[in-house]
Amino acid sequence: VMEGVALLHKSGLIHRGICPDNILLPIDGTAMLTGYGTLALRTGGSELKSQLYAGYAAPEQYSAAEFSGRYTDVYALAAVTYRLVTGQTPVSAPQRKVRDSMETAHSLESSVPTYFSQVLSCAMRLDPPSGCRPCRN
């Protein structure tokens, strides 16, 4: 899935709809990202907005005043990973903006290494442009 998103980004596209519902896992075990149906329209300057998936949509997707970028998909990938390792859907971005109450992955599942939990928290920061910069380190 991450390789597919990397190819999208290399092509200058942003998915904006990454969530468990858009990830298929066929019998051979190779995960596939779906939900591309309206990607061209969403990136072509149309008024069509991407569907928002609570817990997986980045904060900037809820605001017409903020821009989306690669960091939008990074947030969603981290949210999907958070769900994968904890079994819980992350708190939605609007709820977190009111009161940042999301527990770390490590606090929900002690087998998740602290450093990995910190990477997920970093990628899911509420301030979009700085959301993924620290995660490169």
Where is each model-derived feature located?
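Activation loop
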Residues: 46-55
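Protein kinase catalytic-loop region centered on the HRD/HxD motif
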Residues: 1-13
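C-terminal lobe helix-coil module of Hanks-type protein kinase domains
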Residues: 55-137
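Activation segment
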Residues: 38-39
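Conserved protein kinase catalytic/activation segment
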Residues: 22-35
